Amino acid sequence: MSKRKVLITGASGYIASLMLPTLRDHFDLTLTDISEIDRDGNKVEGVNIANFIDPDRSKYEHLFENISGVIHLAFKPHTPRGAKTENAPIDRFDNEHENIQMANNIYRCAYDAGVSRLAIASSNHAADWYEHSLIHERKMDLVRPTDFPVSDNFYGWAKAAYELLAWPYACGIFGRKLETVMLRIGFTRPIIVTDYLSDSPMTEQTSSGIAEFKRNLGAYISPRDITQLFSRAIEAPNIENEHGIPFVIAYGCSDNTRRFWSLETGRKYLDYQPKDDTEIIYADEIRDLLTGDGTVIRGGKVGI
């Protein structure tokens, strides 16, 4: 039996590096990125160079020919790699607008080429206002994919826009339904205790290193779980909702004891069955940082 033909954008990026060892065996891949060199300076074999922000789709639309599914991971970071300072959050709109333009170019090329399924790397930040303002204050226990997508930053706004932008393609208004799965990916990096000590700058989502540690225990997705999630997003036989629209938004985290995102849609439509739980994987780290001698840390999920 022949392998399903799948195109991956952002193939030289970090998330792709977690999945490629397995996906190379599972699918017949076409890899694309703006560079064939990864963050560590290593060459990623088989990468086709393409800039999907370019409005001239004729430069890369051939890459979508005879493709069954697209995994879209590519994005333009708000601050160039190697820059000494980051752009201020209020100055990141133009960059994120380009990411939305890129997403539409991907959708349009896929639609025109007859691609049947998209698996898009959205982000938990598409609805991160709930986390920052309610979850952390323990006024809300779980964010669901059906909650109205509101973000307190332009990155999350762009990811929510990805999701809304795909709906016209999915609903069939242009002539056919382009099946689409939006995956709101969580925290993909290894959790290293020293990153969360008092003198650490690791406070991107919270006010302290300890709070960030607890947050990432809930948000983490392991390499094998994220690989399973994207594979199921491409292969799930039927993703139509109750209205007959093949469109799914699903959170991407492992089955963590401390998670604060619902996995209901991933389980229902994709048969996503995560294998890992940070409470087990990082049991020693949790014991050392949260329950060791002299600690006075409130238990449970992230929150005050």
Regions found by a protein language model. Name each.
Residues 278-304:
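Amphipathic terminal alpha-helices
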Residues 90, 94-105, 113, 157-158, ...:
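Glycine-rich NAD(P)-binding loop of the Rossmann-fold in SDR/ketoreductase-type enzymes
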Residues 105-152:
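Conserved Rossmann-fold NAD(P)-dependent oxidoreductase catalytic core, especially the SDR/UDP-sugar
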Residues 141, 150-180:
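Active-site Tyr-X1-5-Lys
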Residues 188-191, 196-211, 218-246, 255:
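Alpha-helical substrate-binding/gating segment
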Residues 126-128, 154, 171-201:
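Flexible, glycine-rich beta-alpha linker
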Residues 6-26:
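N-terminal Rossmann NAD(P)H-binding glycine-rich loop of SDR-like oxidoreductase domains
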Residues 45-100, 109:
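NAD(P)H-binding glycine-rich loop region in Rossmannoid oxidoreductase-like domains
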